[in-house]
Each structure stands twice: as C-alpha cells, then as structure tokens.
Amino acid sequence: MDRPYDETVDIPDSEDIATPRLQQSLAENLDKLRDSYGDNSKLLTKTNSELANRSIKTASKSVIRMDSSSEKLCDRGSSDDDDDDDNDDDEDEDDDDDDENANIHDATEGVYNPADYEHLTVSSEIKEIFEYIQRYTPQTIELETKLKPFIPDYIPAVGDIDAFLKVPRPDGKPDYLGLLVLDEPCANQSDPTVLDLQLRALSKQTTTKQVTVKSLENAEHQTKAIENWIKSIADLYRTKPPPTVHYTKNMPEISQLMSEWPKSFEESISNMQLSLSQLDCSLKDYVDIICALLDIPVYNNRIHSLHLLFSLYLEFKNSQHFRQNESVIT
C-alpha cells in the first residue's frame, strides 16, 4: 500500500544543512517510470500527477518543519543572549558593590583625609611632616599562637563501697586491717597536766576546777621526769600573758610615774634623810605615805593603788637603763 511518508530532518544548533532539492528527485522518478512502462502515456501522466502532488506535499511539510526549527534556533539564540546580558548585569552590580564598599571603607570615621587640612596656613616643615602620614604603610605582623597546657583541677572520684571481702590469714587469726583504730605514741608526748594548765591560761578561766596532779613513784630514780616538769612549768609562766586589771578609778600611766622628779624635790628629800623603815605607823598609813611620794592616788579601796605600785616596781626592775646603772655602781 502506498502511504505518504513525511521526511523529517533534525537540525542541530551548530550545523547548517541545506534544504533538500525537490526537482532533482522528481526528474529521477520520471526517468525510472519511462524506462519501466515504455509508451503508455496515460499511465505516465497519471503517475506524473501523483508524483507531483506527493512531491508538493512533501516539500510543503519539509518547509514547515524548517520554519519551526529556525524559530526554535532563533528562540534559543535569543535566550542565550539574554543569559549573557544577565551575567553582564550581575558582574556590573558586583563591581558597583565593591566600589561602594571601598567608598564606605575610605569614609571610615577618624581616617586621615588631607583635603580637610589644605586650608590651613602652616609652614612647609609642618606640611612635610603631614606627608609622612600618607607615606606610611602598616606592616602585617602575624602573631604566634602559643599553646598553653590546660591542667584541670583534681576532682577525687568516689570509689566503690568496701564489701569487707578480705582474704583470711593463713594462720586463722582475725585480721583487723582497716577496722582497728591504733593510738600510736609520738616521740615527745605532752603532759596532760601541763596541757590543762596551758589551756586554762589561754582561756582565762576564773572558776576553779579539780585538777589531777601527777605523782611519781620512786621519784629519786626519775630525775629526768622531774626536770622536764620544772622546765614545762617555767615555760608556761614565761609565755603566760600578764593579767589585766580594770581600774574602777582613774589611775595614771606607768610611763608617767617613771618620769624624772624635779631637781628641787630630789634635793629636799636628800637633805631630809628620810628613813621610811623607822616610821612608827600602821600598814594603811605606810601605804598611803609611799603612794603619796610616788604620785599614786589612793581611794577607799587600796588594792588598785597597791597593784599600780607593784607594777611600777616591776617596770623599774626590768628596765635596762636601771640595770646598766646598777652594774656601773657595783
């Protein structure tokens, strides 16, 4: 059966193909028919008309396909041109952004601008000095990163609970390792009695309580223990702070009582040749006389006056100045 066949030609983008020649194909077909049918004119005219119609239809369809393919090529080319234009526009926008960033960087606040100082009337030396600002190029210095060891704090971890599963001793005796509290004596043990006295001296307790006095058996053979006891008590009294007494009345300072007497008063006492040991008076009167000579006030209660008197005596006795005078006299 004779069915019309449409010839299609695929045209790629980068190739140019010429349009098929319809006249050449028509002439070739007529020559073939003449050779095969001879002088049969009617059949020849009929076939010529059929071939002509078929060739015209084929040519029209091929022309339509060529037009559609050319339109596609034109559309594709226009799209490529549009893409190129878009890329150019993007590059222009990027350049504009870079220029704007550069302008923003140049317009940073505080940057030296020589145009701001052109109107100043200064000497040439000052102008040369300002030119060094533009000549200066900062150096890029890469700082070395020094690694320091990070040692975290030691945090002890809680271990497992001891299940007391111990390996028994081979001799069968109980092993109290970790269960028995041992009271091992130190090299120099302190005496409980001396320690109690030291604590009482530090706490300044006024209430009396029972004290267990240490006793020694065969003391004549334990001379070392007796010497240690005497030494510890002497150290206790040496380090013991002096007692503090709060006077109910106003009393002068010891430094004021130790001040030198006036010369007239010393001369009068030396001329009188007063001997206090030969005075015939009571103890109260004797205390009043001595306190009056030393400028110590006496109130109704003489205990505070006597305490100040004996404190003054200890100060004179322990004074290095009077010790040197006694050594010179002797």
UniProtKB/Swiss-Prot annotation:
Forms part of a complex involved in intraflagellar transport (IFT), the bi-directional movement of particles required for the assembly, maintenance and functioning of primary cilia. Residues 7-16, 80-101 have a biased composition (Acidic residues). Keywords: Cell projection, Cilium, Cytoplasm, Cytoskeleton. The keyword tRNA-binding does not apply. InterPro entries: Intraflagellar_transp_cmplxB. Belongs to the IFT46 family. It is found in: Cytoplasm, Cytoskeleton, Cilium basal body; Cell projection, Cilium. GO terms for cellular component: cytoplasm; intraciliary transport particle B; microtubule organizing center; motile cilium. It comes from Schistosoma japonicum (Blood fluke). This is Intraflagellar transport protein 46 homolog.
